[in-house]
Amino acid sequence: MKASLLNKLDNLSDRFEELTALLGDAEVISKQTQFRAYSKEYAEIEPVIATFRELRKVQSDLEGAQALLKESDPDLREMAEEEVAQAKEALTTLEDKLQRMLLPKDPNDGRNVYLEVRAGTGGDEAAIFSGDLFRMYSRYAEKQGWRVEVLSANEGEHGGFKEVIARVEGDNVYAKLKFESGAHRVQRVPETESQGRIHTSACTVAVLPEPDEQAAIEINPADLRVDTYRSSGAGGQHVNTTDSAIRITHIPTGTVVECQEERSQHKNRAKAMAWLAAKLQDQQEAAAHKEISETRKLLVGSGDRSERIRTYNFPQGRVTDHRINLTLYSLSEVMAGGVEAVIEPLLAEYQADQLAALGD
């Protein structure tokens, strides 16, 4: 293991001892905010320290076994050789585990997200596929125990959505969905196609982390134009006699958000403002992320909304993620909500990319 990583682990060990003492201090215990902060830090460090201590023990066992290799007794040497081999194998496993534990954490991983699915090229078929994609993510969310709340939906003339925006709430939503942003292409025979020809259509997906309330971007009310209109689509039959739907335009950036799913204009406005904050924060972070990507070209996670990331080929039952050259012939399972078959390899590849950067 690199000296810099060992030094970092030694520093973490010192901090862990310090936190242990602080959490037993009566004065700290009486200050709930401080106590919670220390407890959270302790919980994050504790698994790393436990693994580091295990590594130190294995290193000690290895040194002891290597010393026995010098013994004249052949049976003792044979036993020592086995112990050395086992210790070296355990050491490699623990070093790899520790390196992964020390990878930089994405501060947004634990956040809820705003999921945007929009029809691109392909007309009615693109809208229908947008509906299929949104259904895929909704079923995946259900399997994860997440909650999906539609904020705005513009339905297609023949089904699906021209655009659908939803808030997805649960544990580690952004961590799982953050690499879904980009252009998704579908190849299939549309229901409206009489001659059986395969058409190619596209949709774009954007996944934006919901900002922390305390760290949320400041928005000047003078920079906003707020329009109200009568709601349509889901729930519209209940509220279409009043202007309950809200459209907010952030004038400096031209960013527009709207929410029409609640019967209350006040609730729609609150949800639209939260979504606007997420979009503005995403725009700010995109510039910084672009610099990182250009410095060291990331295999996944470029975040480019226009980048074609995946193809769904229905005649072949194939789904291909172009970023990691992953091809699966289980399209029906993926579309039924089993998208983890694509997400998990993406996350593994990203982690490998981080490990490579750690070694540079």
From Swiss-Prot:
Modified residues (N5-methylglutamine): 237
Location in or out of the cell: Cytoplasm
InterPro entries: PCRF (IPR005139), Pep_chain_release_fac_I (IPR000352), Pep_chain_release_fac_I_sf (IPR045853), Prokaryotic/Mito_RF (IPR050057), RF-1 (IPR004373)
Pfam entry (one): RF-1
A GO MF label: translation release factor activity, codon specific
Coiled-coil parts of chain: none
Any single Gene Ontology cellular-component annotation: cytoplasm
Description of post-translational modifications: Methylated by PrmC. Methylation increases the termination efficiency of RF1.
Cytoplasm in keyword set: yes
Cystine crosslinks: none
Record keywords, A-Z: Cytoplasm, Methylation, Protein biosynthesis
PROSITE patterns to which the protein is assigned, alphabetical: RF_PROK_I (PS00745)
Family under the similarity heading: Belongs to the prokaryotic/mitochondrial release factor family.
HAMAP family: Rel_fac_1
Function of the protein: Peptide chain release factor 1 directs the termination of translation in response to the peptide chain termination codons UAG and UAA.
Official protein name in the record: Peptide chain release factor 1
UniProt source species: Ectopseudomonas mendocina (strain ymp) (Pseudomonas mendocina)
Gene: prfA
